[in-house]
Every structure is written in structure tokens, then in C-alpha cells.
Amino acid sequence: MKMTTAIFDLDGTLLNSLGDLCDSVTYAVEKHGFPPVSMEQTRIRIGNGVRKLVERSIPEESRTDEMIDICLADFRAFYGEHMMNRTHPYEGIVSALETLKENGVTVGVLSNKYDSAAKALIEHYFGDLVCITYGERPNIPRKPDPTSVLQLLDELGGDKETTLYIGDSATDMQTAVNAGLTAIGVAWGFRSAEELRASGADALAYEPSDLLSLFEYGVPDVSKVEKALTGYGFGSHYFATKDEAVSNLRDTCAGKSVSM
């Protein structure tokens, strides 16, 4: 079945924004005498909105609501001025979005980043390649709650059966599962392929071009293909257990060719 609607996560999926996020949260916490934050610390703290990123970057003994609010305000002020300093689209993303648009796929973006920043980044880097962008908005729960993604899907005019939700984190995979959408994990982002698979990814993409075949042909039903595996091997590939074979097959569902 051909897919007609794409909903992408932003940070770690379309944009490598790690450097600017790290610089901004470090500025915010250092201003109040707390230790700087490393790129790796920032990477593992991203995914649940900037308030959570700031909260997790403040030492536990100082982590009061008042201090979180103060540091969050400093983060937003700095990030608003510097969010395009080091941020850039992942290699191949713009080309993939251009191809999706040419093929009639409607594209939306759903982020836990606050709404004004998400919209500014999409406009700057992708322009009209993205139809609608939702960031974090007042009184609407963040991902993985399905409220926002279902609102976005409705506004895009899509339906669940022909929509792929694409992201780089467990939060994204859980969002898709909660909304009843097909979940595609991207292995170039801030989380590992293992985490994505364990969190409910229906298929993995290792590079943006892998997404194109998923939109053209849909995602294979691995449970059905599993029945065809004989001797825990297929083609010239052999595995110690059936689970290992099926795990590898899941990875190939993003356009990787395997002879069977």
C-alpha cells in the first residue's frame, strides 16, 4: 500500500540540533553557578520538551520549580538568538523531503520543542517542504500522548492506514503506537536502533533515502515473513536463532535488499 502522509519528529530526525541545544542549556545552568552540560548529557536528556531538558541539567539538590523556571527562561532567551548557529539538516533529508513532495506525500512535523522555535526552524531549513508544524502548545499534552499527532493528522487530511510516523526516540515510537500509526525509527538520530526497536518501531531507516521505499511500498508485515524463515537463515545470511533472523529482517524493512 502506498503511503500518502508523513509526520516527522524534528530534533534528531530532520535536524541535528544537538550543538545549539547543548550551548543553550549550558548557558542557562552556568549562569546560576551549575556545571556545564556535555553533548552526550544533552543527547540523552532530549526528547520530552525543553523544560525537561533544563530540569535534568540542574543538579538534583537545586532542582526546585522556581530554579527550573528561571533557567528555562534563560534557555529560551539564549536559544532564540542562537538556535541556528550549529543546527543543520541531516545529510539527505532535504532531498528526501523534496522527493516526497514530488510524489504527492503530505508532510507534517510534530515536536516537543516549544511551538515558536519549532516553526522558525522548519521555515528556515525546509520552507514549503513541510505543510504544517506543531510544537509544544499550552494545555495540550506532549508526546507520547497521541492528542497532538491525531490533531495534526486530521489537519493534514491524512488517515492512519496510509500515514508513517518517523522519529528517532522511544518517545516517538510510543507516540505512534499510542495513536495507532505505523512507527518508523531513524537510526541516524539521538537514540540507538536497539532502543527504537524495543520501543515499538515497525521498521528502521538507516539513511533518509530508505524512507522513500517505505512510502512507495509500505512496511512489510514481519510476522508473516517470519513464517517463511527456514533454518534461521534466508539467502546467504544465517543466524543462530530465529529471533536473531527476525531482528535482522526488521532492519531490512527500510529498503535494505536481502535475497530470500
Question: Which residue ranges define each predicted feature?
Answer:
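Active-site neighborhood of HAD-like aspartate-dependent phosphohydrolases
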Residues: 1-44
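Substrate-recognition "cap/lid" segment bordering the active-site pocket of phosphatases
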Residues: 85-88, 114-166, 170-179, 193-195
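Helix-loop "lid/cap" segments that line or gate small-molecule binding pockets
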Residues: 28-29, 49-63, 121, 152-153
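N-terminal active-site beta-alpha-beta segment that forms phosphate/nucleotide-binding
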Residues: 222-260
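Short, acidic loop-to-helix structural element flanking the phosphoryl-transfer center
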Residues: 2, 80-109, 115-123, 146
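Short, glycine/polar-rich helix-capping loops at beta-to-alpha or helix-loop-helix junctions
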Residues: 188-198, 221-225
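Metal-dependent phosphoesterase signature
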Residues: 32, 56-95
